[in-house]
C-alpha cells in the first residue's frame, strides 16, 4: 500500500501488509523563463505548504487548490482539484520509482492520462510506481480563475485588491466554513465525485 497524507483513505480494519510512505522533501526551481517557472516538489511535502510557497513567491496556478489535504505525491495520482482548477493544469512531469524494476523513471504529464479525479496511476499503474517528485509549471504573470461563484462572492466581501494572496485566503475561508477543524470535530473529511454525464444531458 502506498500512502501519502492519508486523505481519501478510510480504513475499516487493520491492514496486514507493507505501507510505503514517501518522505521526499524540498521545493526548488529547476527552470524558468520570462513568463513561467518550473518547480520540483518532493512527494512528502504537504500540499498546502507548496501552495503557500507558490503564492508567497508570486507564482500562480495552484492558489485555488489551497487547503486541500494530503501530500504533493498524491496530486498526479488523484488529479486533485477544486474551484475550477485541477492539478493537470500545472503538472509538467512526475518522477517515480518503478517497484518491479527498482529504477527511477520520469513520466511526462501527457502520459499520465489525467482525468476528473483520476489518472493512469489509479488504473493500469496502480501500485506499480511510487511518486518521489512532481514538477509543476507555474505562471509568473498569473491569470486568476474566478469562475466559481463562491470565490468571487467571498472576494467581494472584503473589497481588497485582487491578488494570489487574496484568492488563497478566500478559498481557505470557504473551505473552513464548510468543514469544521478535525481537531475539534474528528471526521474522515469530505470526499466525493461529481457525476459525469453526456453533454446533451448537461444542457
Labelled PLM ranges:
Residues 1-100:
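Anion-binding (especially nucleotide phosphate/pyrophosphate-binding) glycine-rich loop
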Residues 104-203:
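Phosphate/pyrophosphate- and phosphate-bearing ligand-binding catalytic cores of soluble enzymes
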